[in-house]
Amino acid sequence: MAAVPQLSAPSAPARSADGILIGDRQYSEVYLTIDYSLIPEERLSPTPSMSDGLDLNTETDLRILGCELIQSAGILLRLPQVAMATGQVLFHRFFYSKSFVKHSFEIIAMACINLASKIEEAPRRIRDVINVCHHLRQIRAKRTPSPLILDQSYINTKNHVIKAERRILKELGFCVHVKHPHKIIVMYLQVLECERNQTLVQTAWNYMNDCLRTNVFVRFDAETIACACIYLAARALQLSLPNRPHWFLLFGATEENIQDICITTLRLYSRIKPNYEFLEKEVDKRKVALQEAKLKAKGLNPDGTPAILSMGGFSPASKPSSPRDVKTEEKSPNFAKVKREMDDKQSSKSPYNGLRKENKRSRSVSRSRSRTKSRSRSHSPRRHYNNRRRSRSGTYSSRSRSRSRSHSESPRRHHNHGSPHMKLKHRVEDLRGRHAHKRKKSHSPSKSREPSELAKKHRHEHGHHRERRERSRSFERSHKNKHHGSSHSGHGRHRR
């Protein structure tokens, strides 16, 4: 008979302070127990809201308002008391991690209601939660209740509630389990043989519901809170309970913790009812102050513009010269001389074989004169004053057109001129010298038609277009009688 192999049970993984050792690898572990839902004493003060500038009384009033909103909305939504209690505990836990200044307590309260209804298996639609909170807000403001309009504001509020619900889960590490003392109260009263006293049971239950507005649910466990509620109810109804030894020692509670819970609960009844408008203004002030502090730390003004530092940095007075100074320097008498020297240096390095721009312009003048009459007429721009462009000879009219066109391309220069008679005399002599020089030399485009002296004169000449046309007409009339009969190679091209 074959032997049956024995199956050995797998060995339990070895635990250590750093995690769980499985095989030759070590893995981390996460403990999800109710003990981790209690906040240690060092985190109770200062809270994040107090770090942002809110005092303890204002924060306590905001906690009370948020819990009252959750309780009232839960009643209208017909939620079980366990779901409403879970929502209030989640509300307290969240605001020990975040500040009332940075998060709206109304949005967080609606998110806690929505999340608690899912946890306690009594889900409600988020639309119903928003409508109920809107109705309670109108009643608190003493206004006539009106239905919520499904506009963009409603969509924004809905998105804020959904995001706040995810934020609560993230801040609490998805540890949203809450252990409530409701059943524990009934169980302890059965041990004390007082379960038939309905007044005692209901009074202890009421104290427990009122404790939800305080922070005792995040400081003590459910068994201690149940003992404190029974202790308060017995004292209020003047009922005697075993005290030798004290009855609460049987359930693991201490006298110091019970006294602390009782004092915290009784202080709740002595507080003035919080004013919602006043608390909202206080939170808005702290928001503005916090925003200004952030902008100041970044070096910005409250309106978002960059702040000008008194020491160092850029200063408008540190500029070497203002734009007005530059304009006056350009108009100085030395500026033209310096600019001319700079043009000479640039002309020597220009790609025009060492020729200046003025010489290139004179070459364009000679090219325009060598064109045919038909081409010069087709390319010449039409002007509205045709009576002034008429001439007796087509040869000189084409030359005057090309000459006026080439002169119009030259830049304007503002200089002081002499009398009109002297200007006309110099103009006639200049044109005679040009005409005699053009007869001697060929009309090849490779050479310049004007000597350097005429180029310099042409550079300094300036006048309006009308004056130039008048001068050319007077020259044509006086020069036609002398050279009309002479034949010229350049003029022969324009004859038909």
Curated annotation (Swiss-Prot):
Query: Record's InterPro entries?
Result: Cyclin-like_dom (IPR013763), Cyclin-like_sf (IPR036915), Cyclin/Ssn8 (IPR043198), Cyclin_C-dom (IPR004367), Cyclin_N (IPR006671)
Keywords assigned by UniProt, alphabetized: Cyclin, Nucleus, Repeat, Transcription, Transcription regulation
The record's region (Disordered) falls at 301-496
Which gene specifies this protein's sequence?
ccnl1
**GO annotation, cellular component aspect:** nuclear speck; nucleus
Q: What exactly does this protein do? A: Involved in pre-mRNA splicing.
Instruction: Give the source species.
Output: Xenopus laevis (African clawed frog)
Cite the record's Basic residues compositional bias ranges. Answer: 358-392, 412-426, 434-446, 456-468, 479-496
Source taxon at top rank: Eukaryota
Q: What is this protein called?
A: Cyclin-L1
Q: Where in the cell is it found?
A: Nucleus speckle; Nucleus, Nucleoplasm
